[in-house]
Design a protein with these regions (language model features):
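Flexible coil/loop and intrinsically disordered segments
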Residues: 1-176
């Protein structure tokens, strides 16, 4: 658990939610990973800011200060669980796509990693329980670029009023 998160949560007087633990693990993973993309200098997410920071720091800021609004503004009663479900589903889909050539559809239904990334993670979110970051770390260690894609997806969802044109969102989500 990062010192920053510990201080923030103690200041609020709340026990860490499963999603708070997940965010801490995810941001620690990104900060401590040698992937070149995580060290890139990017504009700091903040209105009218001219500062540049490393991607890993900016991701952490957007995780807490920007993207949460996607779920909060939609009126989810438990927006932490909705946010966590998005992560679980996103990484499960990325895992399925990465494994489709080596794992049959039948075997995929029984796949232990997929079960932990998606089914078990969804159940744990509903029960307000956190059992760790191991499966996410295993996937992201092999595919750190998934974080870059996730960053792009969240930014597009946040910036775009998707009621107007689904085609625009689709074009913005195409891979680099």
């Amino acid at each position: 658990l990062s010192e920053e998160l510990y201080i923030k949560m103690n200041a609020r007087g709340l026990q860490l939610s499963p999603f708070d633990n997940f965010k801490a693990d995810l941001t620690n993973f990104i900060s401590n990973n040698a992937y070149e993309g995580f060290k890139q200098m990017v504009p700091l997410y903040k209105k009218d800011s001219s500062y540049e920071v490393e991607f890993n720091f900016n991701f952490s800021v957007k995780l807490d200060a920007k993207w949460i609004d996607i779920f909060w503004k939609k009126g989810f009663e438990n927006f932490d669980a909705a946010y966590m479900s998005f992560f679980s589903r996103f990484f499960a889909i990325k895992y399925i796509l990465a494994s489709k050539d080596t794992v049959s559809d039948r075997d995929m239904r029984q796949d232990a990693i997929l079960r932990k990334l998606y089914t078990d993670a969804e159940d744990r979110a509903d029960m307000n329980e956190y059992l760790g970051f191991q499966e996410f770390e295993q996937l992201l260690s092999s595919h750190p670029e998934y974080i870059m894609t996730l960053d792009k997806v969240f930014d597009v969802f946040y910036e775009h009023d998707y009621k107007d044109s689904k085609k625009t969102i689709f074009k913005q989500l195409l891979p680099y």
